[in-house]
Structure formats: C-alpha cells, structure tokens
Amino acid sequence: MPTAQKKTPQKKNREAVEQAEKNEGKAVAGKGAAKTAAAKRPAAKKSAVKKTAAKTSVVKKSAAETSAAKESAAKTSAEEKTAGKKTAVKKPAAKKSATKKPAAKKTAVKKTAAKTAKKEAPKTLVVVESPAKAKTIEKYLGKKYMVRASMGHLRDLPKSQFGIDVENDFAPKYINIRGKGDLIKALKKDAKHASKVYLASDPDREGEAIAWHLAHILGINPDENCRIVFNEITKPAIQAAVKEPYPINIDRVDAQQARRMLDRIVGYKLSPLLWRKIKKGLSAGRVQSVTVKLICDREKEIQAFVPEEYWTVGMKLKKERGVQFAAELATVDGKKLALHSKEETSALVKDMAKQSFSVKEVKKRERRRNPVAPFTTSSMQQDASRKLGFTSRRTMMIAQQLYEGVELGRRGPVGLITYMRTDSTRLSDLALDEVRGYVEASFGADYLPEKPNIYAAGKKAQDAHEAIRPTSVENAPELVEKYLTREQLRLYTLIWQRFVASQMTPAVFDTVSVSVAAGERYIARASGSTLKFPGFLAVYADNKKEKDVLLPELLAGEALSLVRLLPEQHFTEPPPRYNEASLVKTLEEKDIGRPSTYAPIIETILARGYVVRQDKHFQPTDLGFLVDDMLEEYFKDIVDVQFTAELENELDEIAEGKVDKNDLLRSFYEPFEETLEKADEAIGEVEIPEEVSDVVCEKCGRNMVVKQGRYGKFLACPGFPDCRNTKPILKDTGVPCPKCGGRIVERRSRRGQAFYGCENYPACDYVTWDQPLTEKCPECGAFMMRHRYKNGRVLPYCSNEACKTRIDHPINKEIEKSRARLEAKKAKEAAAAEKAAEAEAGK
C-alpha cells in the first residue's frame, strides 16, 4: 500500500534545485565574467523543475515509485550542480547540454519506476520445512511466489517444565523454540507483505502439526484454504498443489499432539524416577522402553538356550553312466528323520549301506516367483540395512536429500524420489503408465504383465501417500550418477530398481524333485532348479539367493548306485540377536511406533547406553537389563507390546476423527500417575553392579572397574570424580610386536573402530589398522596380516616388508563373481537406456 508523504515529490525536487542554485551562486561569487551565466541559470532551472514535476506526477501511485523519483531528482540536482560549475568557468554554450539532461532522465525514471513496481508487487508466500526443498520448489513456481523454510518445528512443549495443564483438558503450553526468534520475525514480515500464504510442510501428521503451529504464529485462520501438500517435488505436483489448497486437518493435528503429550507424560514423569533410583541421564519412553524390552527378552532367550545335538545323513548317488548327484535322507519308516546321537546315526548308516537304491518318483513343475512391492518406509530401511549396510538413521537422512532435491547440472535442483515417510504400496496411475512404458521399451513385451501389479496394503497402512518411488523412471541411476554422492546413488539405485521390478513379470524356474528309495525303510530326496525366465530378477535381485542346481535326467524305477553316505553332526542354534533390519521388521509387525520414528528410537537407546552394537547386532548392557527389569516390575503397561500397539491404534482413530484426544490422554494419565506414586515409594535406590578387574589404576592404586560405553566396554577408576583415569580393554591377538617384542593388542578408536597396537604404548608406537594373524608366512616365517578393502576384498600379506608374499583369500573369488554380474547388469541397463533414448528420439 502507498504510504503518506510529509513532502510531495514536486516540493522535494524544487528544494533540491534551489539548493543547487545556492551552491552555484557561491561558486561564481566574485567572478564578473560568469555573472551573466549565473543570472540566466534560474530560467533554465524552472523548465527542469517543470519537467521533473511532470515526471513525478506519473509515479504518484505507489511508495516504491515515489522513492524512485526522489532518487532521480537527487541525481538531477547533483548533475546540474556540476554542470553549473563547469559553465561558470567555461563558455555559456555549455549550458545547452546542462538543460537537456532532465529530458534524458525522463525515460530513465519511467523504466526504474516500472521495474521497482514489478519487484515490489505482492507475492504468494509458500512455507516449507527445509531450505533444500524451498530452493527446488521456488524454481517450479516462478517469480510470483516466494518460498521460505521453517526449519522444522517452530513451537514445542517447554523443556524446563511439564507443559501440559492436566486440569484444563490437557491443554498444552507451547513456546517458541529457542534460537528460532529471528526466523519467526522474518516469516511474519514475509507473510505480512504476501498476497496469500500457503503452508506446505510434509504430508504427514507431523507436517500437519507444523502447519497448524505456523498458522498460529503467522495469524492465519486454520479453517481457511491455507494448506497444500504434494507427494513428490516435481513441477506438475507442485503446480497442482497450489491450485487445490484446503483447511488444516485438525484431526491429524490432534493425533500428533496426543502422541507428543503421551511421550511427554511418560518421559517427563518416569525419567526423573530413573534418575533418582538408578543414575542421572537415563530416560524412559513409550516406544523406546518397549524396544529395549524386545532386545533384552531376545538376549534372555539366547542365554537360556540349551543346544541340542542332531544328525543329518547326506549321500552321493550316481546313474549307470557315472553322472553323480546329491540327496539327503528325509524319512525312516515313513517318519521324519530324527537322529540325536553318533551311535544312533552310525547304526542307521551301516544299515543303509546294505540297501539297494532306486528312483521312486520324479516331479517336474514350473515355479514362479513374484516381484516384491515398491518400498514403504519400513521395507526401505530393512533392505538398505541388509544390502547397503545403512543404519535406519542414515537411510532416512539420504532419502530426505533425494526427496528435497539434488542439483542435476543445468536442470538445477530436482526431487528424485517421492515422500519417504509412508506405509503405502500404492502407485499413482501416472506413475504406473510411465513405468509400464519404460519396461516395455527397455526389456520387451515379455517382461510386462498384462495389467499393472497391485499390492495389498498392510493392515496399518494409512494410504495417504504413494509408495516410495522415483519421481520419473527416466532418471535412471546411470544417468544421474555423476551428480550424486556414493551413498545417494546406492540408495537411489535400490529405490529405482525396486520400483521398476514391481511392475514386471514373475521370474520362472524349472524345478525337479526326486524321491530315492533305499530298501523298504528309507526315503531320500534331491531337488534342483534352473532359471527359465528372469522376469523382474533382470532388474532387482531380492534377498532369496537361488543357485541353479542341476540334476541328471532321471526316470521312476531307474536303479542308482551309492557312492558314499555322509553323516554330519549339528547342534540347534539360539535365536539370533536383532540387527537393524530384523528389529525394524519386528517393530512394524507388532505395531510399535511408526516407521518414521524407528531411526530416532534406535539412536536414543544406543545413546542412553541401554544397548550396544556388536557386529551389527544389538546387545543389551547391564544397565539396559536393570532398567528393563524395573519397568517390567512396576510399569508393566509401559513395556507391554500389546498395550503399546493398542495405543497406536487409538492414535490412528484420533486422526480419523473417531476418538477424542482428551479421552485417550485421560484414560492413560490417571492410572499411570497412580502407578508412578506407588513405584516411587516402593523402589529403593538401585546400585548398578560393577565388574571389578584386576587392573590397578596407576594414578590412585584402586582396582579399575568395567564400564559400558557407546562403543563397547572400557576400564574406569572407581574413584571418579577424584580420579578420572580410564583405559581401553585390550584384546590380545597372540602376535608379537615387530618393533619391541611385546604383544599386539586390539584397541578401539573413539568411534568404536578396531585397530591394533603394541601393549607397551606409549613406549612403543607400533600401530596398524590391518589385523595381525597367528598364521606364519610360508616364505619367511613372519606373521601374516589381513587387509580388508572397502569393496569387501581381503588380502592376507606378510608383515615382513622385505617379503612380498601375498595370498589370495577365497572370499575374493565370490566378490569377483559378484562384481562381474554387477558389471554385466550395468551394461545391460546402459544398453536398455540407450535403446529407450533412441526410441524417444524416433518418436
């Protein structure tokens, strides 16, 4: 809006001219030769003033134009001043050029005013969560929009107090997050001058809550059409979103607030109890405590497990012409084989060796393996853990980068994948049409199913978003490879391949199952399969590794010769510890939390010292067991899997408008508060048992104790805080130090990475990342070392620098085979991309 001016533009211009005239008068005083020029100057100035006044009347409509005219007038007066000085000492003819300058300025003022007016025109403000996303979206929306980032949440419950008024229907007390003050001021300023404001936070409950908080801060009515969402950051999706704004969904906001307040109730009320009874710095949480319980329960199963002995009996058989194949004993006297001792097995083997062998039955069939669904958040985290070795946190961080936009050269920032927090396997019609066209063009009609593959939604799928997929299948990994980091490329390739494979035909195998009779009592079985048609496996190799197992052509009734029997002893194994993938899968199956929360939950329980990672598996610490046992005894509901799952269901119902938020909070809070009071009285102060070592602290003489850190156990002085001495727990490798003859021990870096050094450090500074081996070099007798490359290759080599002995490790052959397959696959993909490009060019 134009603002009122105390002085009109004409008046200001006139004052500027008069000031210039005064200056000129001073410059020519005492010089008679210039008096005539000085006397004529006011007449010239009047015409300049008239012209300037005429110009400024055109720009009277806006404050921006007025300021442009002011600037122009000031420049004009300055030029006239200079011109006047020059004419005062030169010829009067110079005055003509001086009087022409305002006329030349006329068009300049018009252009400047028009340009300024264009710049200052009100724009539509779009608020997103991150700067990377803002940059990408601004490119798609154009100059009529300004896109700003809120940097996530701007308001939250206070850290210094409970922040929930229980007596007033659980009213939350929200405050602006510390450090966000300047950002809030800037957003308010932008919103004030904007023609419209659209809140474009993420399309989930958390994003809906952020939009609701933004509406409060910016003074926007949440019932207005101020909310826009998009599942992918592409030009069509963004432009479609701004055409269809809608009011903020209060039910989804309530669901997020209920979750936040439940977590605050448990964390704020229960954590101080752990501080008082066990030690400071601990925490409890509605989801984290259940996660710790799962890990502790699994460890208890492992500890209680008693291995049982059992035996299998394999055999080598051959046809008359000498073609051998393997089989395994399956049944004895019509019952499943069950051998539990060497004596029992030896007797059976002795009896079998006397029997005649023949083919009893041959079954041939075609087996199909269907492709898997495109990624959800959970399945992406699991696959990235299994195939790429990524933690859930790292997976989500990289996926966020791919979603928000990556610079693709001249194309600028491009969002490469759809929204990465989803539990849906649904694909849009547009995406299905695009990928089906790509499959047919790149692989042929045999790889394209007659109809799109539709996958059943999970029982908890909200189906608000699509599955995780590339925003365009044409952005094949090899085409964007040079713009991505190594980690971005690996995850993007996984997402792209899974999406394309999900819309391809099944893989087809020819399978053969053979039953072999050994006398009347024994039946052995052999099976083989060959890949007949790769189907989706041409793009995406899933976790089921099937090797071609070939059997000779066999006929029912055909006689066979026994080459040898192969009895083998086994022992049953305990259930494995959870790794990242299996833990995420279990949490999802049991409806504990939501996939988007798994990464921060895992990081929290590691940071608190409740669990540690050992060889990529989670192992509970003594502290984890202690806290879990206490919560199990006094707060059964908090660590009960079923109770936590039911709470999740009720949160879903709040989002659907079926359950009132305050009813849920009240039903949880009242019994929890009562249990908390009883537990506080009943639980005495708990002492964490410490494992005392035989290592003496050299600073104070006490026996050091074993402590659990984030990256494993270490020794610490029990005299803390008076004595702060700590030491790593050293693992002897059994290899002598080549420098001083001491022992080489395994140590841990601050990040938990293993390295090797002399036990006499710092007197001896021998150190290496490579693992010393007890094996001796076959050439010189020195101990061997093992170097492991990033690509997985292993190189055993001699520690004697003068000896050049290198030994190839068996694993390297497998790596080479895998690499060859990968190269062949890449070549095939490149050829397919080239073919698709040629087809596109032909169109």
What are these regions (language model features)?
Residues 259-269, 287, 315-319, 367-379, ...:
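Core structural elements
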Residues 233-315, 365:
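C-terminal or mid-to-C-terminal helical accessory/interaction module adjacent to the motor/catalytic core
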Residues 338-373:
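Metal- or metallocofactor-binding catalytic centers and their adjacent structured scaffolds
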Residues 122, 202-203, 279-283, 364-373, ...:
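Conserved short loop/turn motifs at secondary-structure junctions
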Residues 136-140, 186, 209-217, 237-241, ...:
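Alpha-helical scaffold elements adjacent to nucleotide-binding pockets in ATP/GTP-utilizing enzyme cores
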Residues 359-362, 370-384, 411-420, 574-586, ...:
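Short acidic, hydrophobic short linear motifs in intrinsically disordered regions
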Residues 2-25, 29-31, 35, 40-41, ...:
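Basic, low-complexity terminal or inter-domain segments flanking catalytic cores
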Residues 2, 109-260, 269, 330, ...:
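Intrinsically disordered, low-complexity regulatory segments
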